[in-house]
Amino acid sequence: MFWKFDLHSSSHIDTLLEREDVTLKELMDEEDVLQECKAQNRKLIEFLLKAECLEDLVSFIIEEPPQDMDEKIRYKYPNISCELLTSDVSQMNDRLGEDESLLMKLYSFLLNDSPLNPLLASFFSKVLSILISRKPEQIVDFLKKKHDFVDLIIKHIGTSAIMDLLLRLLTCIEPPQPRQDVLNWLNEEKIIQRLVEIVHPSQEEDRHSNASQSLCEIVRLSRDQMLQIQNSTEPDPLLATLEKQEIIEQLLSNIFHKEKNESAIVSAIQILLTLLETRRPTFEGHIEICPPGMSHSACSVNKSVLEAIRGRLGSFHELLLEPPKKSVMKTTWGVLDPPVGNTRLNVIRLISSLLQTNTSSINGDLMELNSIGVILNMFFKYTWNNFLHTQVEICIALILASPFENTENATITDQDSTGDNLLLKHLFQKCQLIERILEAWEMNEKKQAEGGRRHGYMGHLTRIANCIVHSTDKGPNSALVQQLIKDLPDEVRERWETFCTSSLGETNKRNTVDLVTTCHIHSSSDDEIDFKETGFSQDSSLQQAFSDYQMQQMTSNFIDQFGFNDEKFADQDDIGNVSFDRVSDINFTLNTNESGNIALFEACCKERIQQFDDGGSDEEDIWEEKHIAFTPESQRRSSSGSTDSEESTDSEEEDGAKQDLFEPSSANTEDKMEVDLSEPPNWSANFDVPMETTHGAPLDSVGSDVWSTEEPMPTKETGWASFSEFTSSLSTKDSLRSNSPVEMETSTEPMDPLTPSAAALAVQPEAAGSVAMEASSDGEEDAESTDKVTETVMNGGMKETLSLTVDAKTETAVFKSEEGKLSTSQDAACKDAEECPETAEAKCAAPRPPSSSPEQRTGQPSAPGDTSVNGPV
């Protein structure tokens, strides 16, 4: 509806573009210019692709706006120009990448003096980055021609946007070969050496930080690329250059030259920490990141890096003792003089990374310098510095979990470990770790007893104590730790054992989260039986709680089904009794023992299931009760052999006349069929009882009770067919409906002898008598053999035997002559009726027994009609 009436607001840009004197600024003043550009507005893109427009857009980006402009709109046009050029329109990217004059104009921004405008630098970096991503070959070729490009990048590295541009140049090129060419080109330009030179105390802090971050990102990107492309034949040239020993020595020489500059030291340590990221398992809880199929050479630390760092361990140790001067810091806890500082914190991080490599030579140097003792003193001195406490805890855990000797880095020096963990002995004996823990714990308890505050490192101290206990029980150094504890003085050992069983145990018990016995959450009032209280003690409850957690029933016991016990909702047992909309989907399992009766009934059911075309009755109920008429094939079929089952009308349904047209004489114990028409929508048939085909039954059993499923009383066994009582039940308005798959007249209802139907069904008295005698004489044979159903009729002066067969095309059961030569038409039957009108009149005058149909019970005359038995097969 919104688009139908054209209620959407049209863009004003199209109106502006129709003017010949429209300017670029007028278009940029429109609010929806960016949306129209990204929506590929053809007129707008054609306008922007003009040479003067592209040149103006680039000029807005690289030129400083006037100082006298309002600050709110000063950078409006540069911002919109950047967004238009980076809207990723292929036509604009192609024009910028192919026009060298525009590229040169854009490149001229780097020629400005430092520092660059950070906002304009971000616009420039964004435009050039998308050009590198979309047109890598053209842009890289253009930059290679500019011999001062790397110099300008180094010159403006203090601007974060320029640092981002350098990283974009390394990451935006996806094809392997062009990327390798860029790496080789940058390595030839000595980008690594130039960045390392920037990390110098004489440089500014921003340049320190950006140069360090650039080198760290180069290391990470190169290693990630090596993990992704394992089959790469060429190593990353930038990473190989940075890992050289002389480059690391140059970096360390810069930061320790003359004065101590915290910014330069921290930036250099950040580079070293990135190079020491081994990504290998260290102590319990750490997971190996190196892929299984990847050799550890790609994940391990380069030997040259460790050798270069080892030569400067003394300088780093001096930083722990005498850091760069810092002013006194006042905190809520007290006065820090001097504070820990970023320098010493990063030095401790570097020591923890070196301990992770587990290099025997570096471990020996750390023991000689007593660096572990220094950082342990800092742990207890600075009570509230959790960054420091975390790093000290990691160092102690690494020492406790490190194996005896380093097998991978054993070739670094000639001195290998002797199989004895000297650093672990140093931690227990010289650093006196156990004594320091006990003293700090007792001091904290004494302070808390006096009403003081708990020390801030107590949580980390608890974890360190638990790590020692864990290393005593299991781990690569369990035997050595047990021996070191035994070698303690008796007093200290007893205090330690008492501490582990009392203070440490109680603390662990308080810190343990109770998973079972607290705060049961019940979903309803009926859940008490599902959540019963545990009967075991709390001390040994963890394993039992986990076992019960695995075995418990996670959901409540719900009833299987939800429903309503109301009459308007069907029960489960009544589903089979509802009316079906698709009758053709119903399948019956029929008993195949009585082939003759089954064939007859199948024919009736198949005829019933067909949708009758009654020429106007579209809403006829196909399950409405109708009368059944059985006539021989000679009276039903024409000489052509076609059936007329679909030529009926709906007059019978309109006047509501329902009358049964056949009457079984007697009940035969062998041949009986019982059908109940009392409930047409859900009628059922009983095939276990033989079909009734004999005479003698009263007429009131025919009608609504014909389909009854009740067991009839057995009667005298006689012949199943008697044609001496032929009458017609067809009227003029029912003549077209008298054709069913099998018709057999058994009713004695009176009829009009002058109607065409009566003439068609009347037979000569002699023929009728002969048929009756023949049927009576053959009654016993029919009772004995029910597999073959036959009929004997008099056709003219000849006797003819008809057998019940099923037509393969129409699937209807019909009586056919055994010789297959003679076929009696309705015209011949009409001729016989004209020759013997007395017989017809005599039959019409025969008394009619009371009927059970509604019309006969009310005393009103009912129109004769037939009932076609429809039912699914």
Swiss-Prot record:
Any Pfam family: SAPS
Localization of this protein: Cytoplasm; Nucleus
Location of the region described as Disordered in the Swiss-Prot/TrEMBL record: 628-873
Top-level taxon: Eukaryota
Primary location: cytoplasm
Phosphoserine modification, residue list: S315, S579, S617, S634, S722, S853
Biased composition (Acidic residues): 644-655
Keyword entries, A-Z: Cytoplasm, Nucleus, Phosphoprotein
Any one GO biological process: regulation of signal transduction
In-chain residues carrying the UniProt-annotated modification Phosphothreonine: T631
GO cellular component terms listed in the entry, alphabetical order: cytosol; nucleoplasm; nucleus; plasma membrane
Record GO terms (molecular function): protein phosphatase binding; protein phosphatase regulator activity
Tissue specificity as recorded in UniProt: Expressed in skeletal muscle, placenta, heart, pancreas, testis, brain, lung, liver, kidney, spleen, thymus, prostate, small intestine, colon and leukocytes.
InterPro entries with a match to the protein in the record: ARM-type_fold, SAPS
Compositional bias per record (Polar residues), positions renumbered to this chain: 724-749, 853-873
Family (UniProt): Belongs to the SAPS family.
Subunit record text: Protein phosphatase 6 (PP6) holoenzyme is proposed to be a heterotrimeric complex formed by the catalytic subunit, a SAPS domain-containing subunit (PP6R) and an ankyrin repeat-domain containing regulatory subunit (ARS). Interacts with PPP6C and ANKRD28.
Function: Regulatory subunit of protein phosphatase 6 (PP6). May function as a scaffolding PP6 subunit. May have an important role in maintaining immune self-tolerance.
Name of the protein described by the UniProt record: Serine/threonine-protein phosphatase 6 regulatory subunit 3
Lineage of the species this protein comes from: Eukaryota, Metazoa, Chordata, Craniata, Vertebrata
